[in-house]
Amino acid sequence: MTDPLALDPVLPVRQRSERPWNQDLPHDERFAHFEAHVTAGGKIEPNDWMPDEYRTAVLRFVEMHANSELMGVLPEREWIMRAPTLRRKLALTAKVQDEVGHAQLLYRVAEDLGKPREAMLEDLLAGKTKFHNVFHYPTKSWGDIGIIAWLVDAAAIVAQQALRDSSYAPYARTMQKICWEESVHIMHGRDVVVTLVTGTASQRELVQEALNRWWGPLMQMHGPRGDRAKDRDLHWRIKAKTSEELRQEFLTIYVPRLRELGLTIPDPELRYDDEAKTWRYTEPDWDELRSVVTGHGPRSQDRLEFRRLNRDDTRWVRETVLGLQAAAA
């Protein structure tokens, strides 16, 4: 794996302090220098001066990503004890551990932007902040676990790979590690799916039925089409691609792979338009997406309640550790 710091070296504090936007200049001049630097492909470090709009946008983006990693383990966690073999149990356990680790990394990135981790977790559990739509749905079979690990993680990594050049340097560096580990998760998921589709007729049907249920949420996952010119996350280079660009990339890669396995994609309108060089598909249900991510999904409240109970049960551990740290200070 390439060293993330080699891709995005952290400048010494003295050198960064000499940057124009870190100088004692009028706000408008600072803003102009900052905006020009970001637009030209430059990186921003936590100790740099940054406009409130930028800080707020990065924090919101990273916080939702962290929430999604933390909540995203729950659909798969439920299947660790029901995995069909010891090897599958170990692989699924390792995947869940990776995802929790990603959440820890991302909350740490977000903390540097001024919001304490406790506040982020409280907001998540109170339903004040969001997590990705796909983690609000139930997992009904082992086929779901294969589809999640292969296709949900694939849709995620399409977006995450575009974040490796985020203008906020700590986020970009963190994405190097996360993308590498997610690529392993995708291989695990594909192996589960291939094993099932090459097994018995009932095993193959398990995967097809799971794909039928998950296709809608998958197509919603990157969000509705938006106006590139009005997208402030694109303006600040927090992300690099529009929702539709990500969805098109996902379809280009994974539609052929699904068809290669003989699986039927549950969208009769799905086709590639050679003239327009784009995929045509049934418009996703955006009202459903908005309802789900605001806490009205099939398992939204169950998953949040699990996290609340888990947080209460482990409160004594946090209090003990913080007490020991305070005593040693």
Where are the regions a protein language model picked out?
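Extended, helix-rich structural scaffolds rather than catalytic motifs
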Residues: T2-P12, E205-A329
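Helix-loop segments that flank and shape redox-cofactor active sites
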Residues: W49-Y54, G72-A94, A156-Y171
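Conserved alpha-helical segments that form or flank metal/cofactor-binding pockets of metalloenzymes
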Residues: V13-A32, K95-D123, V192-V194
